[in-house]
Curated annotation (Swiss-Prot):
Positions marked as site (Transition state stabilizer): 219
Underlying gene: pyk
Gene Ontology terms for molecular function: ATP binding; kinase activity; magnesium ion binding; potassium ion binding; pyruvate kinase activity
Residues bound to Mg(2+): 221, 245
Protein name: Pyruvate kinase
Protein residues bound to substrate: 32, 244-245, 277
Transmembrane segments: none
Source lineage: Bacteria, Bacillati, Bacillota, Bacilli, Bacillales
Pathway connected to this protein: Carbohydrate degradation; glycolysis; pyruvate from D-glyceraldehyde 3-phosphate: step 5/5
Similarity comment text for this entry: Belongs to the pyruvate kinase family.
């Protein structure tokens, strides 16, 4: 199972039912809607399509609303475009004017108060660089030197690297978009241009007013956000490393180190993190990724990201399906190369000690040591699954939850496969329900060793405090085990020694009432022994112990109830017999 999650931006190239289906089948876990573009009507159409297709495919796909944010842009230019030439001067006005090579205006009136002589102003993703030469507060104009030439079109982005701006946390448009998202029951809000914890709290205030349970992922895109990351994470549910504007606001050579640090801080707190922007950028035009892009995606996974994101590749590119498949294949390959033992050791040192984390560590270590097939997390809020995920176990994590909302929010968490299953509230019912659901997914089958973890008493969120090692399978009989071995073989029911004569016993488990000295030559050739006679001093127990053969004695009605030629597993340590293959210790 692929563990790294894939976020796809839905746009003109991918909004059809046919393409949404292809993206889901290719590996999309979360659909991102960019509210910098499009109307509410257009986005509602996309939401309806995503949910319709996901329901038809019986897949869980979450929806992420990405706000436009309090960005700074230029106003319109004369004839839609102007040419700025290196060496010339240009005036940036706080009053709206039609842009010319001599003067243009910006949407942020306080820019004049935030910059100072020597500050840099970057236009159109940093393609044009200006340096402040003079500030005229009376005229509300900033005179700049043009450091490199370029064409400037309408409404292009403006960045102020190293400058602390006084923009609001969210705009009125953002607030309207968030209320729309609440109405449409989206799962995540990616908040653009977050600089301070108060920016996140403004969004939370809107969510609390509407009693909406939507996770907030701030996008860190500037130096101020980087500087305040610890405080921002305290009030956030996760994080997006938005490398596009970040690479303009800070020197590009610093972005990889900042990415690693942001991911590490999220890993420490067990909060999901998305790495975004230009991951497979060339696939907007080409059907194959570059080697550098493949390395970029893999390194983000090695850094510890929960999810990787596609932007223009799926929103407007020529090869949206191929981009998702490429992302999936890179993720699977990178995960296969991970040293999960070292990863667990590193995470154990990184994450702070607490009661909940102690259970998480125990589950992860036990899963590694016993090589369990899956970890089944029964969870109301998703907290149990996230607790396990932070330790990056090699085993699959199956999150069984009664809530569709929780299942969708688990779609962003590394290694977690969410499954919706209603169930009763008692602890026994919860555990049985979790095991049955895990089997239904096809991820585990009879004979697999799994770990079940949950919080008890049931129904309370954030109380992960229980771990149980469980063997999936049908126990057909039990008695007193002799020795600590286990064996898998085909039964041969022998009411008398004559039933054993002339038989190849090399793959057989002998089932009989009792044995005497005439049975011994046959028993020592067999894989295992099951008898009805009781006691550790019985002939069956003594022979089994002397010959080193896994044996279970005292099994009631063994000859009657255990069929001939049945594949069974003997677990002598527990005195149990399972039908079929069972991965016993």
């Amino acid at each position: 199972m692929r563990k790294t999650k894939i976020v796809c931006t839905i746009g003109p190239a991918s909004e059809s039912e046919e393409m949404i289906e292809k993206l889901i089948n290719a590996g999309m876990n979360v659909a991102r809607l960019n509210f910098s573009h499009g109307s509410h009507e257009e986005h509602k159409g996309r939401i309806d399509t995503i949910r319709k297709v996901a329901k038809r495919l019986d897949k869980i796909v979450a929806i992420l609303l990405d706000t436009k944010g309090p960005e700074i842009r230029t106003h319109n230019m004369k004839d839609g475009i102007i040419e700025l030439e290196r060496g010339n001067e240009v005036i940036v006005s706080m009053n709206e004017v039609e842009g010319t090579p001599e003067k243009f205006s910006v949407t942020y009136e306080n820019l004049i108060n935030d910059v100072q002589v020597g500050s840099y102003i970057l236009l159109d993703d940093g393609l044009i660089e200006l340096q402040v030469k003079d500030i005229d507060h009376a005229k509300k104009e900033v005179k700049c030197d043009i450091l490199n030439s370029g064409e400037l079109k309408n409404k292009k982005g403006v960045n102020l690297p190293g400058v602390r701006v006084s923009l609001p946390g969210i705009t009125e448009k953002d607030a309207e978009d968030i209320r729309f998202g609440i109405k449409e029951n989206v799962d995540f809000i990616a908040a653009s241009f977050v600089r301070r914890p108060s920016d996140v709290l403004e969004i939370r205030e809107i969510l609390e007013e509407q009693k909406a349970n939507i996770s907030v992922f701030p996008k860190i895109e500037n130096q101020e956000g980087i500087d305040n990351i610890a405080e921002i994470l305290e009030v956030s549910d996760g994080l997006m490393v938005a490398r596009g504007d970040m690479g303009v606001e800070i020197p590009p050579e610093k972005v990889p180190m900042v990415q690693k640090d942001l991911i590490r801080q999220c890993n420490k707190l067990g909060k999901p993190v998305i790495t975004a922007t230009q991951m497979l950028d060339s696939m907007q035009r080409n059907p194959r990724a570059t080697r550098a892009e493949a390395s970029d995606v893999a390194n983000a996974i090695y850094d510890g990201t929960d999810a990787v994101m596609l932007s223009g590749e799926t929103a407007a590119g020529l090869y949206p399906e191929e981009a998702v498949k490429t992302m999936r294949n890179i993720a699977v390959s990178a995960e296969a190369a991970q040293d999960y033992k070292k990863l667990l050791s590193d995470r154990t040192k990184l994450v702070e000690t607490s009661l909940v984390n102690a259970i998480g560590i125990s589950v992860a270590h036990t899963a590694l040591n016993l090589n369990v097939k899956a970890i089944v997390a029964a969870t109301e809020s998703g907290s149990t699954a996230r607790t396990i995920s932070k330790y990056r176990p090699h085993s699959d994590i199956i999150a069984v939850t009664p809530s569709e909302e929780t299942a969708r929010q688990c779609s962003i968490v590394w290694g977690v496969q969410p499954v919706v299953k209603k169930g009763r509230k008692s602890t026994d019912a919860l555990l049985n329900n979790a095991v049955a659901t895990a089997v239904e997914t096809g991820r585990v089958t009879n004979g697999d060793l799994i770990i079940i973890t949950a919080g008890v008493p049931t129904g309370e969120t954030g109380t992960t405090n229980m771990m149980k090692i469980h063997l999936v399978g049908d126990e057909i009989a039990n008695g007193q085990g002799i020795g600590r071995g286990s064996v898998v073989g085909t039964t041969l029911v022998a009411e008398t020694v004559k039933d054993l004569e002339g038989k190849d016993l090399s793959d057989k488990v002998i089932v009989t009432n009792s044995i005497d000295e005439t049975f011994v030559p046959y028993v020592e050739k067999a894989l295992g022994l099951i008898t009805e006679e009781n006691g550790i001093t019985s002939p069956s127990a003594i022979v089994g112990l002397e010959k080193g053969i896994p044996t279970v004695v005292g099994v009631e009605k063994a000859v009657k109830n255990i069929s001939n030629n049945m594949l069974v597993t003997i677990d002598a340590a527990q005195g149990k017999i399972f039908e079929g293959y069972a991965n016993v210790l």
